[in-house]
């Protein structure tokens, strides 16, 4: 029988294992690394977690995370308030910002519709999106959702819900990635790229 690491360490491992991408073995390795490097990793991480817990809030406008409410993006007067980009989670918003291709505002849904997981419209920030899309000056809502079954189901549902607002509803183009070679792509990606083709 394997020896226990002790309740404090097991609790740390258990909490780390709840993070996305970390299973029990990875969590155990992470816990050991933190404990071996207490001064360099564990203490600063503990301070950063405490500060984040105390200061980071959810933006009441878009649903992003920031230390201010409304967040820095919603408060930025230089951004195009006529464009709202809808994303699944905050990580997707951060990816869009890293790409630097969008200068409008965002709306974080907080997930996707999923019959399998029992996630319905009431579990997402759909009502606030419809309200924002109906505000004067908003002219386009861009659905930047994953190209998955749940992502497409959610996009279709949102397009129907936004039909009453006087806005254009668009989706991100899908298809061949930059640097992608056709013989390495799956059939669905190639078919979508063909349907989404545009003039050269």
UniProtKB/Swiss-Prot annotation:
Keywords: DNA damage, DNA recombination, DNA repair, Metal-binding, Zinc, Zinc-finger. Residues 82-177 form the Toprim domain. SUPFAM superfamilies: Recombination protein RecR. A zinc finger (C4-type) spans 59-74. It holds the Pfam family RecR_HhH. PROSITE patterns: RECR (PS01300), TOPRIM (PS50880). This is Recombination protein RecR. The keyword DNA repair applies. One of its GO terms (molecular function) is DNA binding. Transmembrane segments: none annotated. GO terms for biological process: DNA recombination; DNA repair. The keyword Metal-binding applies. May play a role in DNA repair. It seems to be involved in an RecBC-independent recombinational process of DNA repair. It may act with RecF and RecO. The lineage of its organism: Bacteria, Pseudomonadati, Pseudomonadota, Alphaproteobacteria, Caulobacterales. InterPro entries: DNA_Rcmb_RecR, Rcmb_RecR, Rcmb_RecR_Znf, TOPRIM_dom, TOPRIM_RecR. Gene3D superfamilies: 3.40.1360.10, 6.10.250.240, RecR Domain 1 (1.10.8.420). Belongs to the RecR family.
